From Swiss-Prot:
GO terms for cellular component: plasma membrane. It comes from Escherichia fergusonii (strain ATCC 35469 / DSM 13698 / CCUG 18766 / IAM 14443 / JCM 21226 / LMG 7866 / NBRC 102419 / NCTC 12128 / CDC 0568-73). Cytoskeletal protein that is involved in cell-shape control through regulation of the length of the long axis. This is Cytoskeleton protein RodZ. The chain crosses the membrane at residues 112-132. The helix-turn-helix (HTH) motif in the cytoplasmic domain of the N-terminus is involved in the formation of spirals to maintain the rigid rod shape. As this protein is anchored in the cytoplasmic membrane, the HTH motif may contribute to protein-protein interactions to form the RodZ helix, which is localized beneath the cytoplasmic membrane. The C-terminal domain may be critical for determination of the rod shape by probably interacting with enzymes required for synthesis of the peptidoglycan layer, including PBPs in the periplasm. NCBIfam families: PRK10856.1. Residues 155-240 are annotated as: Disordered. Residues 19-71 form the HTH cro/C1-type domain. Residues 170-188, 218-240 have a biased composition (Low complexity). It holds the Pfam family HTH_25. Residues 155-169, 203-217 have a biased composition (Polar residues).
Amino acid sequence: MNTEATHDQNEALTTGVRLRNAREQLGLSQQAVAERLCLKVSTVRDIEEDKAPADLASTFLRGYIRSYARLVHIPEEELLPGLEKQAPLRAAKVAPMQSFSLGKRRKKRDGWLMTFTWLVLFVVIGLSGAWWWQDHKAQQEEITTMADQSSAELNANGTNSQSIPLENSTTTVPEATPAPAAPVDTTANEQTPAASTPAPVTEPQQNAVVPPSQANVDTATTAPAAPATTTTPDTATPLPTDQAGVTTPAADPNALVMNFTADCWLEVTDATGKKLFSGMQRKDGNLNLTGQAPYKLKIGAPAAVQIQYQGKPVDLSRFIRTNQVARLTLNAEQSPAQ
């Protein structure tokens, strides 16, 4: 009767209560049980309170309970009915397998998307390259056109400058011929032959004076010796006065100074529309131009030229960065505007 009563009493107790009573009879604490079973104290507490943690699989929970029972010397057969209630076996949720055709369809769709993306990228790159090439080609054609125009203007100016000396020579020849206008002086030459001796004295003066003075020299040679001495200082006096009248022009405050580090095409126009320079300037060349401000400049290679206006450098960095033909205007206050 006593054994049957104790058996019925044990069945009435839950698994957790039986394990806790057995632990207390052995004088073990929850910390000691957790260290021996290599479990957390919270897990031992949940087992004794008949709790099944949601994050713990039932298979692991049943294994922990069996290890706990062996530790406190409780037969596993006595705990099996309680285990079925406390930690029932739960069927694992198996995710439905995706068909191979679905994955293949998705992969095919991703492949089309990547192909379209690469196609758009190539089109954008191609359009950008074509735009850059057209812009670069247009700049090169513009530079070539300006260079051809400047060469044509230089050739035209060269032909005009060559024709001018020929016209001057033809006009000056008749001016030198009126020398026979002194037939009256021949009688003086016959009467005073000694008057021809001062001629060597007047020869250096003939080299330094203009052709109209030659007539004065001829008349001086035909005069007597005494007047000849008085005319020599008169003919010599214009020389120092002409030299003193020649003065070097003062430096123009609006002068435009340019130094070239490479070959560069250039065109400079002043306020009156006069082209001060138009053509190709070579490396290590220098230009010093003066005119009426403001100046309009066209520079084919801005990186190859250094400009000083009113003693201050002109900033061309914005044209150098974009690598394009520089078009700017230099005002009297040195404010370059595109």
